[in-house]
Amino acid sequence: MNPVITIVGRSNVGKSTLFNRLTRSRDALVADFSGLTRDRHYGKCRIGERAFICVDTGGFEPVAKTGIVAEMAKQTKQVVAESDIVIFLVDGRLGMAPQDRVIADFLRKTGRPVILAVNKTEGMQASVVTADFHELGLGEPFPISSAHGDGVRGLIDDALDSLGVAEPDEDELVNDPNRPMKIAVVGRPNVGKSTLINKLIGEERVIAFDMPGTTRDAIEVPFERNGKPYILVDTAGLRRRGKVFEAIEKFSVVKTLQAIADCNVVILMLDAQQDISEQDAHIAGFIVEAGRALVVAVNKWDGIDTYVKERARLEIAQKLRFLDFANVHPISAKKGTGLKDLFKDVDAAYAAAMAKLPAPRLTRILQEAIEHQQPKRVGMGRPKLRYAHQGGMNPPIVVIHGTSLSGVTDSYKRYLEGRFKDVFKLRGTPLRIQMNTAKNPYVDADKGKKGKKR
């Protein structure tokens, strides 16, 4: 699973600036998805080929007893407990503050790995600006500048190295179709996730509770269906202590995001009896950003009348319109209605996500799309899209080569995406398009000639 790195520190030390720098690719990735709601506190990041989940937290006061500050501290303590490593950010310009010592004391007691990062050190001598922070007893302080990016790559590399997160091998970068498909069942508390898993596997392997938010730990349940192996990942069930299952009081966003990042297909469960919430949209947004194949299950459909059903359909279409690539299934997890069609779509979505797209056919589709509608002119010229090939699976990635491709608009990319998906019948999976502008050998040659002395 993707490791979780949490950024903590007192207010105004630059936590959000660091978070935004680490997740910049995430913002760019989803900018053209109309209506997509993003959770500002959680982001999927990548350094080279190493992926991780980053968590931003509010100003941390671990000893606060009441009010909103205490509630923020409670949330931060929970996410620290679920993290693989913590980056403790302090302000190098203002120097040591009493609150820094309080936070350091708390972090030592948690037993979580901690890297002390001294922010806002641009233009300052590292040995001087970090000197005071040695007394916190959290190892060698790491000087960085979140605003300028100085030292950030080294900081994250050190964090991932300390966790033993290596660059994935060639085989790990390619999805193995011989491995069991891994399905993550996700959704906000009490929508019936564990009930669905119980019904799919036909036994009480995961005990369902009728109380919102029951586990921090994703439980993997291997099973077979029609002779085919699967693994179901439940992020809603319970934690096991020996032979006893114990309900946990709080829904875990971190475990949900890890399960999404680690699976092949996501079943997003919604409650037909409740409005689409901001939390529903946040989870849906992360699924899109992770590029996962998706099927939407609207649970408790049997318990509502025709008017409420129509309203639910309309609300999903409006509030989750960025999920238009996925099929929506009304189900009853308790009674088992609608599950046969749901699982057919799970298989179909996985097949679409793993589809092989031959380069000659991709190029032909590209050329036909251009003949039907050319990209808009940029200045005096027009982007030239010459050929395409597949660049990855799960999700499918189409790499387009040509010249002046920086001028291709987001709307034209969506147009091309639709053409590729229609021809290959890719339903249930996002499709990514990458533009690769070719170098002009004549321009490069001219530059070389100008540099020569006669």
UniProtKB/Swiss-Prot annotation:
GTP 2 binds at residues 187-194, 234-238, 299-302. Belongs to the TRAFAC class TrmE-Era-EngA-EngB-Septin-like GTPase superfamily. EngA (Der) GTPase family. Keywords: GTP-binding, Nucleotide-binding, Repeat, Ribosome biogenesis. PANTHER family: GTPASE DER (PTHR43834:SF6). GTP 1 binds at residues 9-16, 56-60, 119-122. Residues 3-167, 181-354 form the EngA-type G domain. The lineage of its organism: Bacteria, Pseudomonadati, Pseudomonadota, Betaproteobacteria, Burkholderiales. Residues 355-439 form the KH-like domain. This is GTPase Der.
